[in-house]
Regions:
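Conserved nucleotide-state-sensing and coupling region of NTP-binding domains
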Residues: 1-60, 119-120, 187-188
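Conserved structured core elements
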Residues: 2-5, 9, 13, 29, ...
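An acidic- and aromatic-residue-enriched active-site/binding cleft used to recognize and process polar
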Residues: 3-5, 59-61, 77, 82, ...
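N-terminal start-of-chain detector that recognizes signal peptides
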Residues: 8-9, 42-47, 77-80, 108, ...
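Short helix/loop capping segments that flank catalytic or ligand/cofactor-binding pockets
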Residues: 9-10, 64-66, 81-82, 115-116, ...
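Short, surface-exposed, charge-dense and proline/glycine-enriched linear segments
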Residues: 24-30, 61-73, 131-141
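Non-catalytic, compositionally simple segments
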Residues: 84-221
Length: 221
């Protein structure tokens, strides 16, 4: 599941390749917009029975919504908003999975706090039985100055410390390449650079108030 067909292909293409190049090839059939999971002894009847399948779902391809499902993989949930219709898609999938004892999984880069995305709603309203993992660099004591101030993503030396923290446990990531891209993006869209590379929850350029300003006016009230 993703906001656009191009985006959903980010996970659908590797899945198709895994099937066609591995032992699952004999157990599944790849179609144009879905993958059929074959039933033992019923290969010829699989399409007619319309049983187990893996579907592509986007904002413009929602024909299967409402069907009972056992799993939904929701890519870049930080881009799911009310205006693009993807919050309705995600919540419908959760209801469908709940009815079948299934699960949904969502992942994303840091979201824009001003958009009230699906990822933001899940994070802020998470129940005890919902697992949420977010490595927030602003909560790491090692990424603060002695006076408690968070590191400045605009400064290369401090930005590198944040990148090392964010990408810890991902040895395949080239931090030099990430640093180059972050530096370039800082020139045109600094808040996006902080969200995408620094994993920080900062508002986009359209924000009418600075982060924390509204809340600080009511601190201690």
């Amino acid at each position: 599941t993703a906001n656009s067909e191009e985006q959903v292909r980010n996970i659908y293409r590797p899945l198709v390749a895994t099937i066609l190049l591995g032992p699952l090839k004999e157990l599944m059939r790849v179609r144009d917009t879905f993958i059929r999971i074959l039933q033992p002894g019923r290969e010829g009847e699989a399409d007619a029975l319309d049983l187990d399948r893996i579907d592509v779902v986007t904002a413009s391809a929602k024909s299967r919504l409402g069907n009972p499902i056992t799993d939904a993989e929701q890519d870049e949930a930080g881009l799911y908003t009310k205006s693009n219709g993807m919050i309705a898609v995600a919540t419908t999938q959760r209801r469908g999975a709940a009815g079948m004892g299934g699960r949904t999984h969502a992942w994303t880069n840091a979201w824009d706090p001003g958009e009230d995305s699906y990822a933001q709603q899940v994070f802020e309203n998470a129940e005890d039985d919902v697992f949420v993992f977010y490595r927030n660099p602003d909560l790491a004591k090692s990424l603060r100055h002695r006076d408690g101030r968070p590191l400045d993503f605009n400064l290369k030396s401090e930005r590198l410390k944040m990148l090392e923290y964010v990408y810890r446990g991902s040895p395949w990531v080239d931090l030099n390449s990430i640093e180059s891209e972050a530096k370039a993006l800082m020139k045109t869209d600094p808040t996006q650079a902080e969200r995408f590379f620094g994993n920080r929850l900062v508002q986009g350029g359209g924000a009418w108030l600075e982060d924390g300003l509204w809340e600080s006016c009511y601190a201690g009230a």
